[in-house]
Amino acid sequence: MSGIDASQLDLIVCSTTTGDHLVPAEACAVAERLGATCPAFDVSAACAGFVFALDVAEGYIARGRAERVLVVAAEQMTRALEWTDRATCVLFGDGAGAAVIEAGGDSPLAVELSTAPDVETLRVPGLVGTSPFKASADSASVLFMNGRRVFKFGVNAICDTVHKLASDAGISVEDIDHFVFHQANERILSQAVKRLGVPDERVVRTLRETGNISSACIPFALDRLASTDALDAGDTIALVGFGAGLDTGGYLLRWK
């Protein structure tokens, strides 16, 4: 879709927490499949990862280190689930999305990255090996989520980040044409939209198609928005991802 060849890429950044490998980086696997020879590495910021990866790409371009960066978000959340836990297994899915970021375009109108340090609310335990020096009660590395805590954090993260993006860009929330939020669950989206007071038709929803596909939610939803007649040149789009860590990433851009 970008009309460029893999040989023209200067960098590949991949956001994933559920890749095919712990080592090497999943971005290296993407580079191999594409036949690209540029540097490639991963960003791990859970469901906020795509926005964090966008900011990394923008930084490389702004410093003149790259002209074209492939940003990928790819997740297989189903491999991290406990399938007897209906509080989590019914929410998640697998998916991927990607974007090519090029020099010469407009910089984002505003960027907001934040962390509210918390490693307990939403987590997947580390490797369970066979070392005799470290016993583990975990039989598998599966996802744990405190749903109530995630709900409260998610609503606040969306609303606070949207207001900060608008303020930094010198516009009002009402001036933002489209909202692409992390698709955690419908309750979080509905409550955030209600609190923000924005028209529901401005908010992209893809949950019924994919479920929660972690960092791939935002590029997938952005692609869905781009394929409709609702998006016009010059429209402003607010991207907000939030997830384990507890990390939040916000990006305000103008569509061309």
Model-derived segments and spans:
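Conserved active-site "lid/cap" helical segment
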Residues: 1-10, 128-177, 188-196, 221, ...
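Short beta-strand-loop/turn "lid" adjacent to the catalytic site in phosphate-handling enzymes
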Residues: 8-21
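Short beta-strand segments
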Residues: 15, 44, 69-75, 101-102, ...
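Short glycine-enriched loops at secondary-structure junctions
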Residues: 17-20, 114, 128, 186
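Claisen-condensing/thiolase-fold acyl-transfer catalytic domains that form or cleave C-C bonds
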Residues: 18-19, 29-32, 37-39, 45-65, ...
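Short acidic, glycine/serine/threonine-rich loops at helix termini
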Residues: 23-25, 81-85, 248-252
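Flexible, glycine-rich active-site loops centered on histidine and acidic residues
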Residues: 62-96
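Condensing-enzyme catalytic core mediating Claisen C-C bond formation in acyl metabolism
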Residues: 85-152, 156, 160, 242, ...
